[in-house]
Structure formats: C-alpha cells, structure tokens
Amino acid sequence: MVFSFSVSAGILKGKITDRSGESLPFATVYVHGTTMGTSANAMGEYQLQLPAGTYKIACQYIGYRQSSLSLTIGADETVQYNFQLEDQGLQMKEHVVKASEDPAMYIMRKVIGRRKFHKDQIEAFQTGIYMKALLKTRQTPDKVLGQKVNKEEAGLDSAGKGILLLIEQIATYYRQGGKERTVIHSVRESGDPNGMGVPKFPDVISFYENNIHISSQLNPRGFVSPLNDFAFNFYKFRLEGDFKEGNHTIYKINVMPKRLYEPVFSGNIYVVDEDWSLHSLDLTVTKKSNMELIDTLRIEQVYLPLQRDLWVIKQQVLYPTIKIFGFDFTGSFVTIYNDQKVNEPAPDSIFNEKVISEYDAGANKKDTTYWSAARPVPLLEEEAKDFQDKDSLRQRFERPEYIDSVRRRFNRPKVSSLIIGGYTYRGKDDKFLLRTNALLTGLANYNTIEGLNIAPKFSLAWSLDSANSITGTAALRYGFENGHFNAIGRINYVHSDREWRTKYWSAGVEAGKYVFQFNPNNPLDALYNTISTLFYRRNYLKLYERWNGYLHFTKNHGNGFRWSAKLGFQQRLPLQNSTDFSFAREDMGGFTENMPPEFKGYSWEKHNAVTAGISISYQPGFTYVKYPDYLQPYSSKLPTFTLAYEKGIPSVLDSKVDFDKWRFSVRDNISLKLLGNLAYHLSTGGFLNTSQVNIPDLNHINGNQLTLASPYLESFQVAPYYTYSNQSGLYGEAHLEWQLKGFLTNKIPLLRQLRWYLVTGGNVYYVDQNLYHTEAFVGIDNVGYEKFRVFRIDLVQSWNSMNLPVTAIRIGLSPTSIIRLNLGDRSGEW
C-alpha cells in the first residue's frame, strides 16, 4: 500500500521533455493497466522502481500525446530511458448538436448528468501517498513593517531568493463509509529533524462535488465546480478537439467564466467519451475568483482507468503564488497516489472514529538512505542542497552562543513596543517569558473618575518542566486626579498532560485591589473611552473599586469538554468623578455622574460579597491526530455549548449578597457554501433567587454608544450600557450574522472590483414587552487595500421598549480579516 522499496527491484529512470527539449514538470509515468507509477520532478526527471519482469510503461502529461515503452527489467538493474512527448494532436469528432451552440455543451451535459454517479461510485478507497510540499521566495524585502528581515536565518541568498519550506511525506490513506484515516509512515522536514510535516494531506479536490472547498482562508464560499449541476449558469465551455488514448476518446474542453468575480475556475478539463468521467484537468483560480490570501492557485490532476467506467486519481499538483508585504512566493504541493484500491473493505481495526491521522513510531527519524530508496520523485539539485544547507544552518543556530545572541537582540526594547504590542522578554532556553501592555492596549488612559491614569500590566509564564508551569498576571494603576493607587495579581499552577495536548488543569489564586466596570464583561474599552471623553465629552465609562480574593480552578479534558470553578471575596467601594477636563467644547454636552442613572433605585455603598461560580462548556465532534509521543485534538465544526451558574453567598464574611444566577449559550459558524457563512450566538438565563442583588450582579447586556463597533456576536451596537440591566427570572438573547463573502456584491461593478462584502443580521434581547431591545444591521466588510482589508462599516437600526429607535453607523475591525488588528484591551475584568 505504501511507496515501498526493495533491494531486488530494478529502476527505470530518465527525463521527460517535449520535442524542443523543454522539461515537462510532474509528468506521470506508470505501468500500463495498473495504478503503479510515479511522477517526474519539476525538471522532468523521473525514477520508477519495478520488480523484475516485463512491463508496458506509459508516460503522459496534460496537453501532450501519451508515449509508451515496453521493457524487461531485471533485479538490481537500472534502465535509462528519456521520454519525448509530442503536442496532443487534436481532431474534431462530429457531434449532433444545435447549430447555435458549441459541441462542448453536449459533452458537458453528459458529464454533468454522470457527476453524482462518479461521486458516489467510490464507497471505499485505499491508497499509498507521497507528498512533497515546496514553497520558495522569488523576492524578499529588506524590512517588513519596520522590522528587518533576516534572510540568512531563513536560508535565503543575498538577493532574498531560496526555499522557505520543503517537506516530503509517505503515508497510507483509508476512506470508507464516511470515516477516514491517514497513517503517516515517514516525514522529512528541511531544517527541522523533529518536524512532523502536516498531519492531514491536501485533500483530493473532487470536481465531482458541486462546491469545491479548498480552504476557508482562500474562499469560505468555496468554488463552483465546472461539473456543478448548474454549471451553465457560471461557465462557458468550448470544445478544443479530441484525441485517442488506447481505446478511449478524450475530449479537451476549455472552461471559461461567464462573468468576472464569480468563484469559478478557468482552464481545461479532459473528459473520457462514453464514460463521461474526468481524464485530467488543468484549472486556475485567481483574485478575480473572489480568492483571498493568495494571488493564484493552479490545480493539475491526472486520473487513470482502474476498471471500466472507473477512473481514479493518480496525481494532484497545486501551484500557489502569493505576493504580500514585498514578498513574492511560489510553490508546488505534489501528491502522488499509488496502489489504489476501490470498494475493497478495509479491516474495521483501521478506523477509529476519533483518530483521523496517525504517525508511525520513528516516522521523522528515517535516514537519507531510506529516503533515497523510498521517494518516488527525484529531488531537484536545489532541494537536495536545501536539506544539506538547512541541516548545517540548524547546527549553527542551535549553538548556545547563537541562541543567546538572538535572545538578547529580541529582548532589546523598541519604541514600537511602547505604542502597540507591548514589550516581551524571553529568558534563557525560553523557560521564562514576560510581557507588558502598550499605549494602545491600556498602558495610559483618561476618564472622569481618575483623570489621567497609568495602568501597566504584566503577564509571565515560567516553565518548570515539559508538563508543569507557573503563569501569572499583575496590574498596577494610579489615577493622577483622585490619587488612588491600585495593585492586583493572579498566579496559577498549570499541569499539562504530556501525552494529550490541550489537556490540562490549572489552580490559582487572585488578590488585590483594582477598578472595575459595573458590567463584569467590560463592554467599554478604556482606550475608546479615553477618545470619547477627551474629544467628545462623553464619559461612558463607569467604575468602582474592589478588593478581590479569589480561588480558581480550571480543567480542560482535551476532548471539547472544559469546566472551571471559582470561590471568592469582594469588597466593593463606590467612586465619584474627580475631573471634568476635556478638549471638546462644553456645548458638546456635559459629563454624567459615575453612578449610572439607571441604578438610582439601588443603595450603592461599600459592602462585601462572597460568590461562587462554575462554568461548563462542551463542543462535540473533536477528532485527533496521534503523533508518536502525544495526541493532538483537531478542531470540530459542531456548536459549542456553555452553561454557567453563580451563587451569591450571604452572611459569610459579612457578605451582603444572596442570589442564584444561570446562563446557557450555544454558538456556531455554519458554512452556507456559495451563500457565505452564518454565525450565531444564542443564550438564555436569569435569576433563580433575588434575595440580595447588587449592581455588579445584575443581568447585563454588552451595550455600545460609540461610533467604534463593539465585538460582533457578543454585544449590541446601539444599546445604552446599563438601560437593560435587570434581575429578571428569564431572558433571551440572540446574535445572528450572515457574512455573504462576495455573494451579490460580485455582481455589482464597483463593489466587486473593491472586493467589499455584504454582511447583515440582527441582535435581540428580550425579557418581556416592557424590556426588550432589537437591532438589525447591514454593512460592508473586507474594506481596505490589498491584504490590509481589516475594516467593517455597518448601518444599524434599533427598536426597543423605550420607544427610542436609533439609527447609527458603526465602524469596526473585521473579525474575518486575514490580518488581525487588536486595539484596546478586553482580555479580562482587569
């Protein structure tokens, strides 16, 4: 099943060119009548191991006439043979078609009519796989965003050219009845002797599917297959001609988009007459196909006949090109399939519904002798050199003195660290890590309670060994107007399971005094409030001081199930405004008191509160990759369910709270394929007991009264911060967002050139007919230039129980952007 090798096998090797001597990269060489074969490398060089015997060898390349060779080869014999392929001579077979249409239309109707048959005919599939991933740079800038690019460390030459990624793997793949399993036998990663490559190979891109999903990062809508049931709505087809290959007539059909900016392919497909199946294809998607992240992706596939009416994949090559930040990348991802078996049941022991990929022990420890014999595709000279050079570079980079020099260089403070991102300090051997915040993430703020305040925050991670660590966070804060100094800290002991990644437990303690918003979800970011206070005279931020003493425990089971518990003491202290300074004119409005007017009915004074809480979340459907030494969870596509309960405990330590509060939520992001994505966050909850409830304990919604958007699917864009706070026994909350991802806008001339996407949806909070808030919005996402498409602009309309409808514009950072910007700090209560 795998790409095996034998000391008694003969070797057929050579080069594949066209008539002019030009190399034919990744041409296919195989034993006629079987699926045993190989592929040439990028220079057309091939090598095929054969047991002693007599064979008919076929060589083919898309767009060229197949060539064959008959030979007898002995054990340990090497035969040199160079294939020279001629252009495919095409002829036009007569077809009974409408006078007004291209003959390709008749052929494509036949192919589309058999699409589902070919999609479903393979119920069980087994194959050996060889994959080689190569990513090179043709151009590298000297600096990116002000940071120098170290070309030497990346293994590039002085011109910035070279190989960035080189991986080869050999595996066996099984699929049966909706289950799949990949067993990786060997892997080699240039520059990393411990590298494990990729646990899941690039999938066979089945053009028999209506919608081709390659990657959510490329296009979450997927692409329309030329064999789609409604392909004629998206494509034009032109018959280029036909040719004979053995007993088969093969049609070459040119595939063309009907309209620009549709998620479609262009290129050529080759179709087998009467079988109406794919013979091979050469298709491309570009930016004009609504593709993100990369600039072009070319896909080549070659199929071989396994039996009558059944053609199976032999080879798939992906050619991406990417231009970003001055880099120019190109690559090839070659996957060769060998010894395919169709509809032969695999043993039940092969499949484990949870483990989808598994590595053999020592998979990444194979020596060069193994790879020289096992690899079916000869390495290029530059690839062989890259393996050697990267090994030499690695040995140099692993020297203690070099590692220490890199660490010292990394630890040098930079001006940019003060402004955005914060400063990071790495200790020796990376056992200690310290991070700070920056100006744009909360280091300095302004509000009417404290005036100018300095609030440095520190987070640390100290690795004790491979399974145990200590993490901590500390924050200091000084308000220059009210003169209050606050300090708080949290420290955790974390134990991780060495054999099951993401499986851990954590226990910790928190203590100190700090300032907090009345809504513990921190709906208003301090940076945004600074802007609104200083320039618009809007002091939306309302704070109180609190002494904290908490015990925390969290356990993640590594299978989608996670729970946490906490028990703590609070002493809550009221605060008042201490300044009314603003750059804005006084006629723009006056500042409001620190106590929100909605809470005038509450007795807000110094008091103690003892609370306990537990939270449980579960996301079913986790699968796993089994590495030689550990298990790695693989993300699930199913919803996440969360249940939380909080208890206010009266009398203990003079606690003045007595309540029981719960909340249940479910959230998910569903692919609607060509229609985009549908994301939702639904929740319900309320109080079971309201004997003593104070302001921070209420049911709060995350409101927003700024032009800057608050987090999507978490908040209400035009709701006041505290108008809907309540202690009701039951409420319902829903956030729904349809991200069209180019659907509809790709038909509007200006918008499709700008690659702006529509987004629409709504937010609802409902207690009863006297207390509710509803929002509907429509917006433009993906706003920006080139790769910097980070903005989103919404028009929001609200209806509410106060009979005060609001229409407003909200400008935010797109949550679906490839490039993420993080401004402000919403990392926790403090």
Language-model features, listed with the residues they occupy:
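Structural motif
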Residues: 10-24
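A short, solvent-exposed loop/turn motif at the edges and junctions
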Residues: 31-32, 58-70
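Short, acidic Ser/Thr/Gly-rich low-complexity loop/linker segments typical of extracellular
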Residues: 34-45
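Structured extracytoplasmic
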Residues: 96-250, 256-264, 325-438, 442-445, ...
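Transmembrane beta-strand segments that form the barrel wall of outer-membrane beta-barrel proteins
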Residues: 97, 282-287, 433-446, 457, ...
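Short loop/turn motifs that connect adjacent beta-strands in outer-membrane beta-barrel proteins
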Residues: 119-121, 413-416, 425-435, 448, ...
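Residues that define the transmembrane beta-barrel architecture of outer-membrane proteins
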Residues: 450-454, 483-487, 545-549, 606-612, ...
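C-terminal outer-membrane beta-barrel translocator/porin domains of Gram-negative envelope proteins
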Residues: 504-527, 531-544, 601-602, 640-747
